[in-house]
Amino acid sequence: MKRKLDANDVPSPEAADDSVKNDVDNLDFESLNLDPRLRQALVKEKFTKPTLVQAKAIPLALEGKDILARAKTGSGKTAAYVLPILQTILQKKANDPSLKATTGLILVPTRELAEQVQNVITTFAAFCGKDVRSVNLTQKVSDAVQRTMLADYPDLIVSTPSRVIANLGSSALSLENLTHLVIDEADLVLSYGYDEDINALAKAIPRGVQTFLMSATLTAEVDTLKGLFCRSPVILKLEDKDDQGSGVSQFVVKCAEDEKFLLTYVIFKLQLIKGKVIIFVGDVDRCYRVKLFLEQFGIKSCVLNSELPVNSRLHVVQEFNKGVYDIIIAADEQEVMGARKSKKSKEAEENDAGEAAGSSDEDEGEAQKPSTTRSDKPSEKRRKTAGKDKDYGISRGIDFQNVACVLNFDLPTTSKSYTHRIGRTGRAGKTGMALSFVVPADQFGKHKPTSFPTAKHDETVLAKITKRQAKLGHEVKPYHFEMKQVDAFRYRMTDALRSITRLAVQEARAREIRQELIKSEKLKRHFEENPEELRQLRHDDELRSARIQPHLKHIPDYLMPSKGKKGISSENVGYVGFRKTSENRIRKAREKNRGKGKGRNYAGVKKVDPLKTFNRGRK
């Protein structure tokens, strides 16, 4: 079709955008010519229309083209590469039913994301019988078991780069027949310290492999991966309505360090936020401090702890998605506690042209400020990170469903991390809210028990967050609490915080790890042979993580604001006794010892009358 020329004899711009959008809106999975078994699985999962990234990427993938796609996490990127790969595998099996070869490799940065991708593959291959076999190499199984799993040549492998290299080195895995390579969350793979593994993998992969690079941002790491694996890829910079973040309302509250706990208590106890909430904090200790604090008021929550096994963490996410818990507390340690980053990432961390998101120098400064304080104590950093799962990550990739609010209890150290955190809510066209606590510089360090080092730079980081969000067309608005009404709850917050000591936090962490040891399948036989060790793990009654005060669970009417009384019905308030449910341990011990003759209560000692008894008093 010919286009009209303007006054300068230049063709007028094509009005293709609207037509493309209309084509995407009218497109359905039937028109993609997928295998009937895949369409049946899509119908079962109630997938009616493809998302923007699926509508764009799937036809290109079926044509055999390399794809570099930038789309928001939660936009359907996983299905965009899983469906074409499954389609290709089914076509090959139709031509040669006896074919046994590993043709697809999916690389992800974290174990949680690997499990999530594996579940998606299982869902879409539900009606394919034995024609499609996939293996997740990040599972905690022995090398011998993994070798057995790989000996049957599964069609698809989901793994982190380090596990692939380990199995290539032991000759358990062969990539000779590989036809599809996917690197999901490509901008994170190098940031998580997989540089050497990726370079080794680039040499092991045969030429002509179709490559998918899926990423939320186009950074220096993505350019590096594109140079290693892609052949003139089709670049998709997809800006859906959801990608603009229009559904997320962003608010910030400036408060003192102890007021973070006070406001958190008021928010959840008065039910100011309805629905599921993710609370992001600075580290694991902080997770348990917040959890124990909420427990004082009868508010249930769960902790996503990087020290626990991957299956336990996945179970926590599943329980949260099912609605068992409405509050999940997480420490995004890869970003907050200092993830290993490549030089290119540090130099151009925010040079994402598609997002127009500020200069790299800004975020470099953001990342360096907290790190300078940590670098003064290298031994402490090594001790803290020891035992943490390298493949752990929370703010990216994990599919948290129906999150109403993201609460940044501790502000992240970079604006990029902030963007990824708030991306957990307002997904798939839904609305959401992000609320961040910011400690002013003059308030930092005034309440030592609740202080956190990175809060020193909160105002600087907030300025950069505001600037970045403004460039993206979003506004970070101030949120004001009526402090006169909030202050009425302060004494209850103080009572609760007083019982949550550093020792209580350590005991809570130790107890959860002991519970995981008891649940461990691998240790069951060991405990059967050594029942005494199991008994020691279970009998931990003396470890009281925090003194529970039952009266804190109930809010008296005189404390309730007039508007708050309507929000909480009397049906939700259970019986709360005004007497202590357990005796005073110290008083009970004194009485017991007094009966045994241990210690003397001089005020209560009766004088011995020698005329009434033959027992002489002690000289």
From Swiss-Prot:
Family: Belongs to the DEAD box helicase family. DDX56/DBP9 subfamily.
Gene: dbp9
Binding site for ATP: A71, K72, T73, G74, S75, G76, K77, T78
CDD domains on file: DEADc_DDX56, SF2_C_DEAD
A single cellular component GO annotation: cytosol
Physiological role: ATP-binding RNA helicase involved in the biogenesis of 60S ribosomal subunits and is required for the normal formation of 25S and 5.8S rRNAs.
Domain Helicase C-terminal: 247-484
Domain-level remarks: The Q motif is unique to and characteristic of the DEAD box family of RNA helicases and controls ATP binding and hydrolysis.
Cellular localisation: Nucleus, Nucleolus
Gene3D superfamilies in the cross-refs: P-loop containing nucleotide triphosphate hydrolases
Catalyzed reactions per annotation: ATP + H2O = ADP + phosphate + H(+)
Keywords, sorted A to Z: ATP-binding, Helicase, Hydrolase, Nucleotide-binding, Nucleus, Ribosome biogenesis, RNA-binding, rRNA processing
Helicase ATP-binding domain residues: 58-236
Protein name: ATP-dependent RNA helicase dbp9
PROSITE patterns, alphabetized: HELICASE_ATP_BIND_1, HELICASE_CTER, Q_MOTIF
UniProt-listed SUPFAM superfamilies: P-loop containing nucleoside triphosphate hydrolases
Main location per the UniProt record: nucleus
Motif residue range(s): DEAD box: 184-187
One MF term in the entry's GO annotations: DNA/RNA helicase activity
Residue span of motif Q motif: 27-55
EC number: 3.6.4.13
Region feature Disordered, mapped onto this chain: 1-22, 340-391, 586-619
